[in-house]
Regions:
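Non-cytosolic beta-sandwich-type ligand-binding/adhesion modules
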Residues: 1-112
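Conserved active-site-adjacent core of cysteine acyl-enzyme catalytic domains
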Residues: 163-232
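Active-site-adjacent structural segments surrounding the nucleophilic cysteine of cysteine proteases
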Residues: 90-176, 228
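Generic structural signal for bulky hydrophobic/aromatic residues embedded
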Residues: 17-19, 88, 146, 154, ...
Length: 232
């Protein structure tokens, strides 16, 4: 039977996250589809993932209203309210299998009034990492890798930013593009539940208040991008 449909607020973009243990010789592949104008789109794959693979995110392609990017699905002039997810498990050894602990979806809701939430005072405990002092070949994704290392090492792990950078690197994309789905999967493979989502200030404050670690990426407005600022 098909997977159950996930009811969601009206949205124009979707991102899938997964956490999985993938021993050598195994991999997982998450897929999603959405309902547009009463019909399900075709399944979109976000690439096979394992820290041991030369992994590649989705190849950018446009099918009708669906624009598939390496780590997200964006609708062009359309919206959706439902999604379906599925995840495939692969192995080269019948005695070894991947294990999946989380499959999640986040959407970019439309026509939502921004919420600020209740202010919070918190002390940030940051690791003394600097992008300029890390491996030069990995610097384009090192900012996100440092964030992941800072969060996980705060809880007792001993993971180098370079290890995260290699585990989440998307070999299909340019080094300037960060694959957030692969980044969440990299944290998950070290035992830290992690997912990527769109959020606002209210969500950020509630996560901090609850004691969770949060990495924030700010999306530039079209006007800011036209002025030369990076998209994220």
């Amino acid at each position: 039977p098909p997977p159950p449909a996930v009811p969601l607020p009206t949205f124009d973009a979707l991102r899938v996250s997964w956490n999985a243990g993938t021993p050598p010789g195994t991999a997982v592949e998450a897929q999603a589809r959405v309902m547009v104008d009463g019909n399900w789109t075709s399944w979109s794959s976000f690439g096979r993932w394992s820290p041991y693979l030369e992994r590649e995110g989705a190849a950018p392609v446009t099918k009708g209203a669906v624009n598939l990017l390496p780590d997200s699905l964006v609708l062009d002039s359309k919206t959706a309210t439902q999604a379906q997810l599925r995840i495939y498990l692969y192995t080269k050894d019948e005695h070894t299998t991947p294990s999946v602990s989380l499959v999640g979806v986040s959407v970019r809701a439309v026509d939502v009034i921004p919420a600020g939430g209740r202010p919070i005072n918190a002390r940030l405990h940051l690791m003394p990492y600097a992008v300029a002092r890390r491996a030069p070949a990995l610097q384009p994704v090192m900012d996100l890798a440092i964030c992941l290392a800072s969060l996980t090492n705060r809880w007792g792990a001993d993971i180098l930013p370079e290890e995260f950078a290699l585990a989440m690197r998307d070999c299909r994309s340019t080094d300037a593009e960060r694959n957030l789905s692969f980044a969440a999967a990299a944290a998950g493979c070290w035992g830290f539940p992690c997912w990527a989502c769109w959020g606002n200030l209210a969500l950020l404050r509630s996560e901090v208040r609850a004691g969770y670690g949060v990495i924030v990426g700010l999306e530039s407005t079209p006007a800011q991008q036209a002025a030369g600022m990076p998209p994220v």
